Amino acid sequence: MTATDGGPGGSPAKRPVAGDGTSIRPMDVDLSTRYLGLSLASPIVAAASPLTGDADGLRRLGDAGVGAVVLPSLFEEDMLAEDVGLAAGLEEGSRVFHEAREYFPDLAAEKGVADRYLGNLERAKGLLEAPVIASLNATSRGGWTRYAKLLGRAGADALELNVYFVAADASRNAADIEAEQLELMSAVCREAGVAVAVKLSPFYTAMANFASAVASAGAKGLVLFNRFYQPDVDLDNMTVLPRVSLSRSADLGLPLRWTAILRPILPEDVSLGLTSGVHTGHDIAKAVAVGADVVMMASELLAEGPGRVQALESALREWLAEHGYGSVSDLRGSVSAASVENPEAFERANYTKTLRSLERLGR
C-alpha cells in the first residue's frame, strides 16, 4: 500500500504505509543505516568538533546513541609548523643534501602531531562501540598517503578527507586545481586501506561533474558541504578577524539541493553525508528524503550537548511513524531528483516563483 505526500514544487512522492493497515509505532521505527560500508545504529553522525576530540565528549556521545563520530582533523599546517624549528637548524645541510629535506618533515611530524592523533584515535576506539572516522585536512599530496595508511592500520573504521582550499590564485585555472585535488584523493583512497569519504566545498565550477570524478577516483562517500570559516574586519584596528559561527536550519537548503541532484547520478555504493544546517528531527527527515545516508552534526550538539541526539532520534521516529515509514531506508531518496515529477524544482524552475514570494513580503 502506498500514499502520497507533497514533494518539492508540489510534486508527489510515494510514501509507504504499514502493509496490514495498522499504524506504525515510533518505538518500532528502524533508524539503522549504512555509511561507507559500515552499519550504523542511527543516521546521526557527530561531525568533527571539540566534542569528538575530548574523552568526556566522546563518552557522552556514545551514551546518547550517536551513529558514528568523526574525529577532529589531522591538519597539514600543524605538522608543517612542528617541522619549522628543526628544519631551520638543518637548513644549511639541506642545501647540500636536498634529499634530506624531502624525508625530514614526515619523520619529525610522525614523532609529534601524528603520534598524538593516533593516540586520540586509540582512545576513541576504546570508548565507543559506534564507528570512529578519522579525518585528514589536506592541501597537498605530500605525505598524506602514508598518514592515511597509518590511520587505517591504527583502527580507524573509515577516513574523511577534508579538502579545504580557497582558489585565490588568479594564475591557476579550475581544471588544473581539480586535477591536482583528484590526484590527491585518488592516492589517499588507494593507500588508506579503509573506505574514504571526501568532504567537498560547494564552490566547484561544475559540481555534478566533479562529484562524479571524485567517486571515480575511489571515494566511497561524499560529504556535502565543507563549512568555510569566513573572515571579518575589525574597523577599529583595521585588521582581519577569524569568525566562527554556528549553522542554522536556514543553511540546510544548499546541501539539500545537491544531495537530491547527486543521489541519482552517483553509483549506489557511494554514500552521501549531509552537513550544515541540521538541527531538528524534520531537518534529518528532509536530508534522508533527498538521498542522504547520514547527517553530520556539530553546531546543534555543541549548543545543546550530546544528549540532544536522543531527542532528535525520538523526533525522527515520531515523524516517520506518523507518515507511515517503518525505517529511514523506506524514506531515503523518495524526494531525490530522480523520484519527483519535476526534478527542475531543485535547479531553476521555482526561481521566479520564489522571487514573487519576496515581493509579497514587501507589500
Can you name each region flagged by the protein language model?
Residues 3-13, 17-19:
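Compositionally biased, low-complexity flexible segments
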Residues 22-131, 138-145, 319, 362-363:
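N-terminal capping/small domains of soluble enzymes
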Residues 24-27, 247-267, 281-363:
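Alpha/beta catalytic cores of nucleotide-metabolism and tRNA/nucleoside-modifying enzymes
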Residues 44-47, 69-71, 132-136, 159-161, ...:
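Hydrophobic faces of well-ordered beta-strands that scaffold small-molecule active sites
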Residues 59-64, 126-127, 139-273, 281-286, ...:
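Alpha/beta enzyme core
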Residues 76-80, 165-169, 229-232, 301-305:
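Short gly/pro/ser/thr-enriched loop/turn and capping motifs at secondary-structure boundaries
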Residues 81-94, 233-247, 302-323:
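C-terminal helical cap(s) of enzyme catalytic domains, especially alpha/beta-barrels
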Residues 278:
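Glycine-rich phosphate-binding loops at beta-strand->alpha-helix junctions
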